[in-house]
Structure formats: C-alpha cells, structure tokens
Amino acid sequence: MSHHWGYGKHNGPEHWHKDFPIAKGERQSPVDIDTHTAKYDPSLKPLSVSYDQATSLRILNNGHAFNVEFDDSQDKAVLKGGPLDGTYRLIQFHFHWGSLDGQGSEHTVDKKKYAAELHLVHWNTKYGDFGKAVQQPDGLAVLGIFLKVGSAKPGLQKVVDVLDSIKTKGKSADFTNFDPRGLLPESLDYWTYPGSLTTPPLLECVTWIVLKEPISVSSEQVLKFRKLNFNGEGEPEELMVDNWRPAQPLKNRQIKASFK
C-alpha cells in the first residue's frame, strides 16, 4: 500500500485490508440499510441525547476529514437509551462527503446515497477512556445523520465559516461554544446494528445508530467542505472529496428499527 491509507486509487478502501485485515471482518461498517428487511423492535427505547452542557474545544484537519473535538473529561454531552446500556460520552464529530451531491454518505438506504454523513462519536464511560473503549465490542456508539442538499442548516454555519482556517492536513483552530444540538433533525427515529469504525483501524467496537430523518444543508455549505485539502501546506493540492467507505457485507447481522 502506498505510504498511508486514504481514499485514492492506490491507498483507498479496496486496499485497506492489506494493513488492516479486519477490513474483511464479520461486523464491518458502513452497510446498506434495506428498509424492507430491517425489523421493527418494540423493545428498543427512545434515544436520549443530552448535549446541553457540551464543551467544544477545537477543530482539526487530520488529512482524512475534519474533527470537531469536545472535552470528554466529564459527563457533559452524553448519549443514552436506544439500544445502549450505560452512558456514552461525546468525544468528536466529523463528516464524510462526496465530490457531487449524489454521493458522499457511507451508509445507504435502499442503496440511496446522500450528499454527506455526520458521525457523532461517543465512548462507553464504563471503560474509562476512548483508547480502552475501542478495544471492546460495546465500546463506542456512533450517531449517524444523513445530509441532503436543500435549504441551509443554520446550526452548521459556524463550522463552515472556520474551514478556511484549517484548509490543509495538520491545521487546527480553537472552536469553542459550538452547540451540536443544532445538527440534529426533528425526529430521533433510528436504525441500529453492530458494526465498526469506517476508517482504519476499522475496529469492530461500534453500536451504530443511524437516524432515519436527514438534515438539509445548502449547496453553498457542502461546497465549502469540498474546498478542504487532503494534503499538507506546501504540498500538491488534492481536494478533500469522496472521503467515504462504500457499504460492506451485512453478513450475519440484523438491522433493527425503532419505528414501524
């Protein structure tokens, strides 16, 4: 594999298994959500998203996407309920997006791709820290939210406006007082299944919770995502687009729905 993993022809998702053999594992993500096969599970609880005390710290271009990082030293922004046992603490969120509006999401719904997908990453507090949590089958809970292009999402604009300052790999900026509640849709109806990180090391530690209702963002907002760079400053420009892993085999897994 050339150099390091990425999304290009020579280091993209079809090559990842060479360095990360779990890429061909039994609970890989993302997957296609077949709405006709997903089974309504009346025992699933409503999701509890408590982000009112969230403390954002920083935004970082890591050369694969950009992460908005949170203070996870206390139970400030937590996810509970739904398919989860216990409390999961928000550590960061990031997006995956396309070069065109017709692709970009990682999960698909009846094979439909959205323009982008938001991942809010939480770790199970019973494991003490994120690094230990990723070693456990129930270590992480990732809330996945689809983005479609339409009217602007006001709650996203603060993110969009800072992207100029983190154009290239390794750049970061202070990013405080951001309220992630502004990125949620009205409905918290969801699908859930056991899966993995969608980027190397692809660890099989994630309870996925994918919301049925997409959020709407404007074409101008998503265009700003596409102006970011995979490369570092002073290197040849490679636009940060199509940073998504395609759907993986469902294998022996059942996707459950919280709604009829």
UniProtKB/Swiss-Prot annotation:
Quote the catalytic activity from the record.
hydrogencarbonate + H(+) = CO2 + H2O; urea = cyanamide + H2O
Q: Which domain of life does this protein belong to?
A: Eukaryota
PTM N-acetylserine: at which residues? 2
Biological process terms in GO annotation: angiotensin-activated signaling pathway; carbon dioxide transport; morphogenesis of an epithelium; neuron cellular homeostasis; positive regulation of cellular pH reduction; positive regulation of dipeptide transmembrane transport; positive regulation of synaptic transmission, GABAergic; regulation of chloride transport
Q: Where is the Alpha-carbonic anhydrase domain?
A: 3-259
Q: Where does Zn(2+) bind?
A: 94, 96, 119
Consequence of changing residue 144 to R: In OPTB3; complete loss of activity
Variant or mutagenesis effect after changing residue 64 to G: Impaired activity, not rescued by 4-methylimidazole (4-MI)
According to the record, mutating residue 62 to T results in: Reduced activity
Q: Which positions does the site annotation Fine-tunes the proton-transfer properties of H-64 cover?
A: 7, 62, 67
Gene Ontology molecular functions: arylesterase activity; carbonate dehydratase activity; cyanamide hydratase activity; zinc ion binding
What is known to happen upon mutating residue 5 to A? Impaired activity, not rescued by 4-methylimidazole (4-MI)
Q: Which Pfam families does the UniProt entry name for this protein?
A: Carb_anhydrase
Give site residues, Involved in the binding of some activators, including histamine and L-histidine.
92
InterPro entries named in the record: CA_dom, CA_dom_sf, Carbonic_anhydrase_a-class, Carbonic_anhydrase_a-class_CS
What result is annotated for mutating residue 197 to A?
Reduced CO(2) hydrase activity
* Gene3D superfamilies in UniProt: Alpha carbonic anhydrase (3.10.200.10)
Record text on subunit structure and interactions: Interacts with SLC4A4. Interaction with SLC4A7 regulates SLC4A7 transporter activity. Interacts with SLC26A6 isoform 4 (via C-terminus cytoplasmic domain).
Q: Recite the other comments.
A: Target of drugs used in treatments against glaucoma disorder and breast cancer.
Protein's name in the database: Carbonic anhydrase 2
Q: From which source organism is this entry?
A: Homo sapiens
Q: Which gene encodes it?
A: CA2
